[in-house]
Amino acid sequence: MQYAIAGWPVAGCPSESLLERITRKLRDGWKRLIDILNQPGVPKNGSNTYGYPD
C-alpha cells in the first residue's frame, strides 16, 4: 500500500527543491518583465504629450 501526504513527493516522482522553485519563478518573472518592456507602442495616459501639459 502506498500513501501520499499532501505536499510530500510520491514514490517515483522527483520533488522540486525550494531553491529550484524560487529560481524558476525569478526567471519567469524576468522573462515577463522583458516581454512587457519590449512591447511596441506609446504608453496610454490619456494624452499624446507623454504626461506634459499642453
From Swiss-Prot:
Alphabetized UniProt keyword annotations: Activator, Viral latency, Viral latency initiation and maintenance
Lineage: Viruses, Duplodnaviria, Heunggongvirae, Uroviricota, Caudoviricetes
Effect of residue 21 to P: Low cIII activity
Record keyword Ribosomal protein present: no
Protein encoded by which gene: cIII
PROSITE patterns attached to this UniProt entry: LAMBDA_PHAGE_CIII (PS00553)
Its biological purpose: Acts as a host protease inhibitor that allows the virus to initiate latency. Following infection, prevents protein cII degradation by inhibiting host protease FtsH (cII is a factor that initiates the expression of repressor cI, the major component promoting latency). Functions as a competitive inhibitor (and thus as alternative substrate) of host FtsH and thereby prevents binding of cII substrate. In turn, stabilization of cII transcriptional activator allows protein cI expression and thus initiation of latency.
Similarity comment: family membership: Belongs to the lambda phage cIII protein family.
Gene Ontology biological process terms from the UniProt entry: viral latency
Name of the protein in question: Protease inhibitor III
InterPro entries: Phage_lambda_CIII (IPR013056)
